[in-house]
């Protein structure tokens, strides 16, 4: 399970919740392990961030490379926190609702693995989809680097949800993969009910992926989400995703919505390469159960 403590980044002045995976034990044992956090994460707690913020120039380059190649859907420009960012909106003929798709670390809203299959495949099932550009850093940036830009994702998520509500009838669902799920969970932890009121269901794909010796610095928000939640991951996913699956399942059960599920796609890895169809079908089948 995750033990949580809030620590301050001296270089940035930002408080961040640290989630430490621990074994089952009594409360006294769990609390004692808090004392080891400064030893485990000295670089995270004391060092200044390597990146000042989202790499907007890289986002612009990626947008220029993909916009002309978009075959399904329409590129749109959304605005948040003083910056424009790319979205790809695709409309279904008979609309059941809207789906906001958040890609993983360092990618873009038409990424061939996970994102593009979902944003097109769910339209075929009657869902309008909006896939947006999440904040990215330079190539090679790791999970701890991306923690510093989690706040940059919050206004983008909110702007995208506003757009979906304006253009879609029915429920609005967030579908987030990998680092996109970290960013969505950060937003929920920070905004609480103000965030939860904005959407109706949540799909997390490959939740909990980080980097070697870089454990999650924030807990999941799943136990706070009294709405339908789908936790889907690959049987050959990253070790952290697999290891923490029971923790996620317990949190989802605690939240109490009977429509929530945890689904393991047996042969799939983190990016669902060659298993895109199973991913789309699993998500679509679960969404159908929301009717």
Residue ranges and their predicted role:
Residues 47-49:
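N-terminal signal peptide c-region/cleavage motif recognized by signal peptidases
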Residues 53-91:
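N-terminal cap/lid segment of alpha/beta-hydrolase-fold proteins
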Residues 76, 83-86, 95-165:
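Serine-hydrolase catalytic machinery in alpha/beta-hydrolase-like enzymes
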Residues 163, 169-225:
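Primarily recognizes the serine-hydrolase "nucleophile elbow" in alpha/beta-hydrolase
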Residues 206-261:
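The feature captures the conserved acid-bearing segment of alpha/beta-hydrolase catalytic domains
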Residues 258-291:
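C-terminal catalytic histidine-bearing segment of alpha/beta-hydrolase fold enzymes
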């Amino acid at each position: 399970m995750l033990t949580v403590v809030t620590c301050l980044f001296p270089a940035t002045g930002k408080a961040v919740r640290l989630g430490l995976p621990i074994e089952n034990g009594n409360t006294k044992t769990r609390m004692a392990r808090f004392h080891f956090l400064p030893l485990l994460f000295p670089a995270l707690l004391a060092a200044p961030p390597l990146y000042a913020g989202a790499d907007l120039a890289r986002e612009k380059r990626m947008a220029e490379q993909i916009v002309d190649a978009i075959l399904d859907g329409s590129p749109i420009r959304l605005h948040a926190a003083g910056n424009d960012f790319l979205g790809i909106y695709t409309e279904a003929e008979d609309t059941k609702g809207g789906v906001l798709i958040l890609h993983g670390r360092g990618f873009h809203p038409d990424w061939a693995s996970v994102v593009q299959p979902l944003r097109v495949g769910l339209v075929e099932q009657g869902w309008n989809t909006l896939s947006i550009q999440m904040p990215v850093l330079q190539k090679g940036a790791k999970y701890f680097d991306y923690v510093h830009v989690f706040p940059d994702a919050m206004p983008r998520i909110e702007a995208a949800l506003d757009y979906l509500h304006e253009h879609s009838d029915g429920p609005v669902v967030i579908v987030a993969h990998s680092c996109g799920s970290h960013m969505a969970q950060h937003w929920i932890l920070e905004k609480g009910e103000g965030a939860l009121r904005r959407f109706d269901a949540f799909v997390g794909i490959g939740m909990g992926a980080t980097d070697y010796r870089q454990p999650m610095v924030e807990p999941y928000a799943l136990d706070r989400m009294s709405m339908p939640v789908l936790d889907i991951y690959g049987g050959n996913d990253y070790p952290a995703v697999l290891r923490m699956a029971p923790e996620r399942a317990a949190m989802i059960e605690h939240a109490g919505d009977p429509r929530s599920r945890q689904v393991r796609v047996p042969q799939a890895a983190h990016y669902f390469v060659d298993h895109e169809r199973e991913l789309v079908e699993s998500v679509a089948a679960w969404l159908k159960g929301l009717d």
